[in-house]
């Protein structure tokens, strides 16, 4: 089972395949990451590999975090993430994780925080239909009815209404890696991924129930 990698979204572009078709892609600067901790079943209760990504200033790192990072011989990393694995024998503390762990044509799942849009109304947040726009109408973008009357006499929990939109963790599954640029640590992924340019992303081999052939990748 291959672990994932952390990266940064650079933006979207286009990629021309072998047949000359234009494919929308997202450029991701992935890694290099360092293995900062190996968690075993004996000491931690489960097997996992923890990696770190992105350097930061020393003044922003507290003493316990410094001691944790010193075990892997790495500098002051900003982001940590761990992946469950079955066999820890193929991983080594302090080893580097790069885009070379992936292959062109491989399916991956990409997770990140979606762009926050603040307080949004019914149309923008839930794609509700608007009201009449003709002269005299007073409910152009109003919610309309939100429930019954005396019975039940309340609005059921979970009713789709206006509120804060975006800014949540989103996972886009089954994206195809179109190209890998090892010299610049770039992954060219087909389609769009969550977040705005510069946001943190978690890229890992695709894992979907009933689709064993999607994982692929190198150990």
UniProtKB/Swiss-Prot annotation:
GO CC annotation: cytosolic large ribosomal subunit
Signal sequence extent: none
GO process terms (BP): translation
Region (Disordered): 124-165
Keyword match Protein biosynthesis: no
GO molecular function terms noted in the UniProt entry: rRNA binding; structural constituent of ribosome
Matches recorded under Pfam families: Ribosomal_L3 (PF00297)
Domain of life: Bacteria
Biological role stated in the UniProt entry: One of the primary rRNA binding proteins, it binds directly near the 3'-end of the 23S rRNA, where it nucleates assembly of the 50S subunit.
Family assignment from sequence similarity: Belongs to the universal ribosomal protein uL3 family.
Known partners and oligomeric status: Part of the 50S ribosomal subunit. Forms a cluster with proteins L14 and L19.
Protein name per the record: Large ribosomal subunit protein uL3
Species name: Prochlorococcus marinus (strain MIT 9211)
Lineage: Bacteria, Bacillati, Cyanobacteriota, Cyanophyceae, Synechococcales
């Amino acid at each position: 089972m291959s672990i994932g990698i952390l990266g940064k979204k650079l933006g979207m572009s286009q990629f021309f395949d072998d047949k000359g078709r234009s494919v929308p892609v997202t450029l991701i600067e992935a890694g290099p990451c360092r293995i900062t901790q190996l968690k075993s079943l004996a000491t931690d209760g489960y097997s996992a590999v923890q990696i770190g990504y992105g350097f930061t200033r020393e003044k922003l790192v507290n003493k316990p975090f410094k001691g944790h990072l010193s075990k892997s011989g790495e500098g002051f990393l900003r982001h940590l993430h761990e992946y469950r694995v079955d066999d820890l024998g193929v991983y080594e503390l302090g080893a580097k994780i790069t885009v070379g762990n992936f292959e062109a044509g491989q399916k991956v799942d990409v997770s990140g925080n979606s762009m926050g849009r603040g307080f949004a109304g019914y149309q923008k947040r839930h794609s509700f239909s608007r009201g009449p726009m003709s002269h005299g109408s007073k409910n152009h973008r109003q919610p309309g009815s939100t429930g019954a009357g005396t019975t039940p006499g309340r609005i059921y929990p979970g009713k789709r209404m206006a509120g804060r939109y975006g800014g949540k963790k989103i996972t886009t599954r089954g994206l195809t890696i179109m190209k890998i640029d090892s010299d610049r640590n770039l992954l060219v992924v087909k389609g769009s991924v969550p977040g705005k340019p510069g946001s943190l992303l978690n890229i890992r081999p695709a894992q979907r129930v009933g689709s064993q052939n999607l994982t692929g990748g190198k150990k």
